[in-house]
Amino acid sequence: MSATPSLWNGKGLSIVCIPFTSFTPDGLEVRLDGVAAQAEFCVAAGNDVALLQGTTGEWPSLSLQERIDLAKEWRRCIPLGHAMKLILHIGHDALVDAITLARIAAVRRNAPDWPALAHRGAPPVLTPAMVVPP
């Protein structure tokens, strides 16, 4: 069976790491000090991609600032020049916050791109621009 070339590495199937977010024992604060060990593990295991805050279900529990801090810490912890791509989950109930996260996702550091995954866990938001005829 031949693998379809991956969007990420162009050679074959990518290995995607879906890390959990570490919290303090009381569950009230995010622990950024665990990100470096997670990133090191994912890199050493040969992962091509890390999907942040997207699939393990913790994103609705995080404040906007916590999500930004986590994204920046992950980006900081991937070794400069390493090929691992990061996908940032940008879904949010507030449109302005989703835009803020999308802007964070657009910042590039050690890879040609930092894709953003948009996902909404709540009903869609309608803005006046969407319902007022041109």
Predicted regions and their residues:
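Active-site beta->alpha loop and helix N-cap motifs at the rims of alpha/beta catalytic domains
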Residues: 2-134
